[in-house]
Amino acid sequence: MGTTKVTPSLVFAVTVATIGSFQFGYNTGVINAPETILKDFLNYTLEERLEDLPSEGLLTALWSLCVAIFSVGGMIGSFSVGLFVNRFGRRNSMLLVNLLAIIAGCLMGFAKIAESVEMLILGRLLIGIFCGLCTGFVPMYIGEVSPTALRGAFGTLNQLGIVVGILVAQIFGLDFILGSEELWPGLLGLTIIPAILQSAALPFCPESPRFLLINKKEEDQATEILQRLWGTSDVVQEIQEMKDESVRMSQEKQVTVLELFRSPNYVQPLLISIVLQLSQQLSGINAVFYYSTGIFKDAGVQEPIYATIGAGVVNTIFTVVSLFLVERAGRRTLHMIGLGGMAVCSVFMTISLLLKDDYEAMSFVCIVAILIYVAFFEIGPGPIPWFIVAELFSQGPRPAAIAVAGCCNWTSNFLVGMLFPSAAAYLGAYVFIIFAAFLIFFLIFTFFKVPETKGRTFEDIARAFEGQAHSGKGPAGVELNSMQPVKETPGNA
């Protein structure tokens, strides 16, 4: 195999794909900053329509729906990933669904002029479906165009896109930028611009070579794309690996979601994929970000919105750090470090919130604990669950597996968002102890069950799980991790 390198074609393709990740992050964070203004819009619109003041219960229900419908859309979208990628391909799927983002942006952007609550809610639903699809398309495409030795680093760019999107939404949501009563429609409708940019750039990106060879049997085109992306003429080893996988796929029928759960070959990697997605959401990160302004306010911070943006900056910086570490330390190690660090920080957050009224310094401890907590999240649990799912499965079951894992991620995201306020009201500062318990459980699970995928081909990983399924062994971390990755040579460095 020739020496692979980071080519302009590869960087361009991955960067354009991560615009979808940016959209997910932006639309996750954009609803939080103008909360008061949007509630006023709901109140005014309903008052005009009902010719009476709406009840507090109706307003609360509608606001909750505006927030939660995004996650419901995400569940629908993530579960529909396979329907698109198997029929249209990875690149063309990303191109097609941008139409959803444009329609959603128009609905949200013109909701105020039309005085329509329904347009706002429908727009949030459609942008949720779009983002759910993106959380499947982007990691899959990046994983399939990246060289084995760089797959983890490029996979982390998916998470970088998400956190940059959240940060941009937080900054643009400031009242003196777009978070004002006059400009909030522009804040929500801004999602149209990345959709148009990505639609314009995607035709210049190649289709996934794995999709072309394995699904479409277009070997010559796949070879040409691989050579251009990786900057080497010698891609014989990768092409042969894809051809072997293509032969295996031709001997099997299309893998459906139901068959994923039935086949002993897929049960263990699917379990790992689901638990890793849960480890991301049940770590408490979204609870911290959804309610960070309130947490900082409770901790005594004078300008909590700026502290929240500070957390977003830390989020972004440590995602970049993870990008450089993931191919050195490995996925499994970084994930465990992240989970362990977050568990410790959760305990410190609890202690500082309990003692802040008695000791002024505890407000500072709380802020530092949150910032370090966010840093540990981006070291492991943030980026790794997204791209490791694509690594654990071969071409056939990959779309269905990503759909199931993505749906679990969105569902747990939705449940945390719905249940955290009640849990926080009932348990107070002790609520973060629940997250600490989850984090410890996920740390133990990762140690015993999650394999190291660094430097290993998709085929190698799939065969390891198949061998264990046939021998009746579970995927204990020691067993699978005792297998050596592809030996580092100039060809895969």
From Swiss-Prot:
Protein source organism: Mus musculus
Entry-listed glycosylation sites: N43
Tissues showing expression: Expressed in spermatozoa (at protein level). Detected in brain (at protein level). Abundantly expressed in the hippocampus, cerebellum and cerebral cortex with lower expression in the dentate gyrus and piriform cortex.
Name of this protein: Solute carrier family 2, facilitated glucose transporter member 3
InterPro entries cross-referenced by the UniProt entry: Glc_transpt_3, GLUT, MFS_dom, MFS_sugar_transport-like, MFS_trans_sf, Sugar/inositol_transpt, Sugar_transporter_CS
Broad class of where this protein is predominantly found: membrane
Region listing for Important for selectivity against fructose, in residue ranges: 277-279
The keyword Membrane is assigned to this record: yes
Cross-referenced PANTHER family: SOLUTE CARRIER FAMILY 2, SOLUTE CARRIER FAMILY 2, FACILITATED GLUCOSE TRANSPORTER MEMBER 3
Function of the molecule: Facilitative glucose transporter. Can also mediate the uptake of various other monosaccharides across the cell membrane. Mediates the uptake of glucose, 2-deoxyglucose, galactose, mannose, xylose and fucose, and probably also dehydroascorbate. Does not mediate fructose transport. Required for mesendoderm differentiation.
Gene: Slc2a3
